[in-house]
Regions:
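Generic secondary-structure microfeatures
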Residues: 38-40, 53, 83-85
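Acidic helix-start/capping segments at beta-turn-to-alpha-helix junctions
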Residues: 36-49
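Cytochrome P450 catalytic domain signature, combining two hallmark sequence patches
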Residues: 53-68
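Structured segments of extracytoplasmic/periplasmic soluble domains
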Residues: 19-27, 46-53, 103-110
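Catalytic cores and adjacent binding grooves of peptidoglycan-active enzymes
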Residues: 64-136
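Active-site acidic/histidine clusters and adjacent loop/turn architecture
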Residues: 1-38
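Residue-level detector of short coil/turn "hinge" positions at structural boundaries
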Residues: 33-34, 56, 111-113
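Short, surface-exposed, charged loop/turn segments at secondary-structure junctions
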Residues: 50-55, 130-132
Length: 136
């Protein structure tokens, strides 16, 4: 199972995520709040996701095969989030992701959000710009 642990995440991302969460809560205390759904992901998990829309039923969810995703390294150069609201209900409103992306971009310009990806937009995804420079 993919990790949700901040200890598996690049320190730049940990700092940016924590600061962005605090600011988001301060600005939007009554809105659904972000939480981490994935930091590190194994190559097997990556290949399973890559199969969607190709050899497995469903829509494509990634363009990255194993080793091509910033999630596939430790520390991870990416994280995914979701939002949880009242009653522990998941909230996938694109507006929440946009608000969080704008906050994190101001806090740490090295972090980019997949909401603006051209080939396969991925609003829950945040990664280090030029992430390959940060992985081994």
């Amino acid at each position: 199972m993919a990790s949700r642990s901040l200890t598996d995440l690049n320190e730049i991302l940990v700092d940016a995520y924590n600061k962005a969460c605090a600011e988001y809560l301060s600005l939007y205390p009554d809105k659904s709040q972000p939480f981490i759904t994935c930091t590190y992901r194994s190559n097997d998990e990556q290949n399973a996701l890559y199969a969607y829309g190709r050899t497995r039923m469903g829509n494509k969810v990634t363009n990255a095969q194993a080793g091509q995703s910033p999630h596939n390294y430790k520390p991870s150069a990416a994280f995914d989030i979701a939002f949880i609201g009242l009653g522990k209900k998941l909230d996938w409103s694109k507006n929440n992701f946009r608000l969080f992306a704008d906050i994190i971009a101001k806090i740490q310009p090295l972090v980019v959000c997949g909401i603006d990806f051209k080939s396969l937009p991925d609003a829950p995804h945040f990664e280090l710009k030029d992430w390959r420079k940060y992985v081994k």
